[in-house]
Amino acid sequence: MQEHVMSRTLARALRPAAAALAALTLALAAGCASENAALSNARYDLGPAGPVATAGRGPALKVLDVAAPEALDSDKFVYRLAYADAQRMAVYRDSRWTAPPAQLLTQRLRGALSSRGAVLEGADGVRAPTLRIDLSEFEQVFDGESQSHGAVTARATLTQDGKVLGQRTFVARAPSSTPDAAGGARALAMASDDLVAQIAAWVGMQAYAGTP
């Protein structure tokens, strides 16, 4: 009888601890689920833009939307396992860009070039020299299972009154700090900034007249 009473007393004493443990377990599970959900729906952009050196002020320039092939004309995050199959592109299942890379680069480029003069869009009716960018590569390239880099390649064409004033292909590379989408996003942001800086410097060296 005495043992039965002691067992009931012990059970009552342990109930609060058991309830607290259960609540803690549920909280941890909810936290893990929330974290996993966040990680499984990651959205990346290029981050804040850094300063771009320009060669003084220049005339107005019309900057068209960056053009891209179908594979890069979406918010999918593209990567390539160069060490295993360099000809095959793949996409992350749970990581995407906030907008197609071409749109992100368009914003970045217009922002950088605006520091040297007025930047017009393609829909503007003003006659002005026109810069067209054709994006051909924007991906995280894995050189090994634990090593990757961001790769961005684009061709810039500057025209005025139907005449080509200059054309050049630009290539930018930046190492990834981690072999995953987060590391790839940081690397591609750095490579994008490098590419934009190269294009801005090239535009600054071209000889073209302003609007009449």
Region annotations inferred by a language model:
Residues 3-21:
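Bacterial N-terminal signal peptides that target proteins for export
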Residues 27-31:
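C-terminal motif of bacterial Sec signal peptides marking the signal peptidase cleavage site
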Residues 33-101, 206-212:
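A structural "domain/chain start" motif
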Residues 33-52, 111, 115-161, 178:
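Surface-exposed short loop/turn segments
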Residues 57-62, 75-77, 127-131, 148-154, ...:
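Envelope-exposed proteins and targeting segments
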Residues 66, 134-139, 171-173:
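Generic short beta-strand segments
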Residues 85-96, 163-201, 208:
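Short secondary-structure boundary motifs at beta->alpha junctions and helix caps
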Residues 110, 114-118, 200-208:
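Sec-exported extracytoplasmic/periplasmic mature domains
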